[in-house]
């Protein structure tokens, strides 16, 4: 459609002859012949400006109503599939200070170790399950670890007792129990910590502190 036109006849403050001529143009030419709205104004004297403003407002509002509504683009969020991967989540290296021992590093196993209450059998069993599912048991086997090998994760050392023997089915036990904890030869968390300190030369093996009698029998049993 053609653009709407408005005719503005300025200088309405001119002599009467000019205003009469403008009235003639308005009636005979623009409005009757072309159908264009005509406004006789005076920009200097600021006369007859309000009718012009109201007409412009009417035109704008009418144009907005006739404008086709734009459809808002739908934002489609496609969540990425979560892939559970174990490769590269931990590393197993020989312990340079313990013969046959291994050190395991990795964000997940180290965090799990710190979150575990080692005085709670169920918590320890849950930790063992998580480490096994992560692939640590298989990794230790491939690294040549034997049952009872000293394994250190996040500064915590323990004797490795695998949940399964290579090629065997897992041993099923009741909730909150772990057959590996029932072995009497397993040392406590405090003993593991002390052994680690002795191994690193932080304390003497037979030093139990002031007013404590040191003996190898006490340490071993």
UniProtKB/Swiss-Prot annotation:
Enzyme Commission identifier(s): 3.6.5.-
Give the multimer and partner information: Monomer.
SUPFAM superfamilies, A to Z: Obg GTP-binding protein C-terminal domain
Where does the record say this protein resides? Cytoplasm
Residues annotated as binding GTP: 10-13, 42-44
Per the record, the similarity remark reads: Belongs to the TRAFAC class OBG-HflX-like GTPase superfamily. OBG GTPase family.
Cofactor list: Mg(2+)
Q: Which UniProt keywords apply?
A: Cytoplasm, GTP-binding, Hydrolase, Nucleotide-binding
Gene name linked to the record: obg
- Physiological role: An essential GTPase which binds GTP, GDP and possibly (p)ppGpp with moderate affinity, with high nucleotide exchange rates and a fairly low GTP hydrolysis rate. Plays a role in control of the cell cycle, stress response, ribosome biogenesis and in those bacteria that undergo differentiation, in morphogenesis control.
Q: Where along the sequence do coiled-coil regions lie?
A: none
User: Record's NCBIfam families?
Assistant: Obg_CgtA_exten
Any GO MF annotation of the entry: GTP binding
Query: What protein name applies here?
Result: GTPase Obg
- How would you classify this enzyme at the top EC level? hydrolase
Which ranges carry the OBG-type G domain? 1-61
**Out of the domains of life, which is the source?**
Bacteria
User: Do you know which InterPro entries this protein is assigned to?
Assistant: G_OBG (IPR031167), GTP-bd_prot_GTP1/OBG_C_sf (IPR036346), OCT_dom (IPR015349), P-loop_NTPase (IPR027417)
Name where it mostly resides: cytoplasm
């Amino acid at each position: 459609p053609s653009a709407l036109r408005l005719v503005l006849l300025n200088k309405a403050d001119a002599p009467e002859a000019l205003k009469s001529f403008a009235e003639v143009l308005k009636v005979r030419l623009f409005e009757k012949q072309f159908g264009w709205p005509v406004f006789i104004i005076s920009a200097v004297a600021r006369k007859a400006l309000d009718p012009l403003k109201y007409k412009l407002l009417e035109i704008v509002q009418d144009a907005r109503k006739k404008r086709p509504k734009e459809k808002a683009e739908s934002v489609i969020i496609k969540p990425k599939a979560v892939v559970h991967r174990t490769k590269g989540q931990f590393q197993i290296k020989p312990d340079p200070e313990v013969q046959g021992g291994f050190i395991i590093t990795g964000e997940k196993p180290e965090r799990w170790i710190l979150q575990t209450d080692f005085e709670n059998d169920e918590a320890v069993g849950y930790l063992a399950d998580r480490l096994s599912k992560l692939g640590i048991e298989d990794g230790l086997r491939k690294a040549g670890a034997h049952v009872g090998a000293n394994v250190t994760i996040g500064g915590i050392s323990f004797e490795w007792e695998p949940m399964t023997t290579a090629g065997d089915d897992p041993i099923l036990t009741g909730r909150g129990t772990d057959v590996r904890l029932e072995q009497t030869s397993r040392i406590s968390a405090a003993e593991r910590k002390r052994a680690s300190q002795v191994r690193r030369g932080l304390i003497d093996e037979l030093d139990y502190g002031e007013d404590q009698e040191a003996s190898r029998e006490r340490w071993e049993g």
